[in-house]
Amino acid sequence: MSEPRPIQVPSTDGVTVIAHDHGGIGPVVLLSHATGFHGRYWDPIVARLPQGYRYVAIDLRGHGDSIVPDGVSMNWRGMGEDVLAVVDALDAGSVRAVGHSMGGCAVIRAELERPGTIEAAWLCEPIIFPNDAGPARTTEGDSRMAETARKRREVFDSFDAVLERYGSRPPFSAVHPDALRAYVLHGFREQDDGSVILKCRRDTEAAVFEHAQTDTFDHLASVTAPVTVAGSGDGDGPATFAPGVADARPLGTFEYYGDLTHFAPLEDPDRIAAAIAAALGLD
C-alpha cells in the first residue's frame, strides 16, 4: 500500500490538524482515532477496505503530526470541530465516518454541530457517557485515565525498542503486528540522539482525558444518520455503555465482539474492515 498524502488543515483555536489522504476516486470515508493515538494506525484497516472510495484518516488536535499553539484547550468540542475542518477542506459536503473511542465521539460531535455532515458511521466503543455511567462518566480534572497517562513512558532508545516492549505485554501484545508497527512508527518521533519520543505527549493525553465530553449522550436522539456501535468483551468502561449508545439512536445498531477488547480495530483488522464495509455500504 502506498503512503498516504498528509494535508495540513486549519481548524479552530489556531490548531492545524493533519488529514492523511490515502487517495482514491469516490465518496470520502473519514477515519477518526482514539485518545493518545493518531490517524496512521488505520493504515491496516484501509488496506483491507474496498477500492472506489477516498479514505482519509485524521490526526486530531494534540495527536500525531497536528500543530497546536501553547495553551489550547483539549476540550472535546474542538475534536468535533477538527472533523468538520477536514470535511470542509476536502470539499466533501458529507462523509461516511469511522471512529474509535474518543474519535467516535468526535464524529458524533461533528454531526451534532452540523447535521447532515455524517451520512453513516461505524463507531468502536465511542466515549459517550450515559447519564447513569457512574464513575466512568468523567469530569474535567477528575480522571483515573489522566493519572495513568501522566505516568506513561515517553522516550525509548529506538523504534525497535518500542516495538519489542509494547509487543511483549498487554494491551499491545494482542494487537495485530501490522497495526502495532503502524502505531509505533507514526506515533513516535526520532530525536537528534537517535532515541524516539511519543508525539502525543503524556501531559497532552492527560488533558484530553480530563476534558472528556460528558453531555453528548443527551443529544444522541437528534442524530438521524445510521450509526453502528461496536462493543468488545471488556468487562468495564466503554464496553459497558456501548449498547446504550446504540439504543439511544433512532437508527442505531449494536455489534458485539466478545473476543476483542477496546483496541478491537488494532487487534483484528480483517474482521473490523469487513464490519466497517458492511455498516457503511462500501461495495
Regions found by a protein language model. Name each.
Residues 12-22:
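A short loop-to-beta-strand scaffold at the N-terminal edge of the catalytic core in hydrolase folds
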Residues 188-247, 256:
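Conserved serine/cysteine hydrolase catalytic core
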Residues 21-68:
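Conserved HGGG/HGGXW glycine-rich cap/lid loop of the alpha/beta-hydrolase fold
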Residues 44, 56, 60-98, 102, ...:
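Active-site loop/oxyanion-hole signature of alpha/beta-hydrolase fold enzymes
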Residues 153-211:
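Conserved alpha/beta-hydrolase catalytic His-Asp/Glu region
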Residues 94-136:
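Conserved hydrolase catalytic core segment
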Residues 127-156:
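A catalytic-pocket lid/entrance helix-loop region that shapes and gates access to the active site
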Residues 257-269, 273:
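Catalytic histidine-centered segment of alpha/beta-hydrolase-like enzymes
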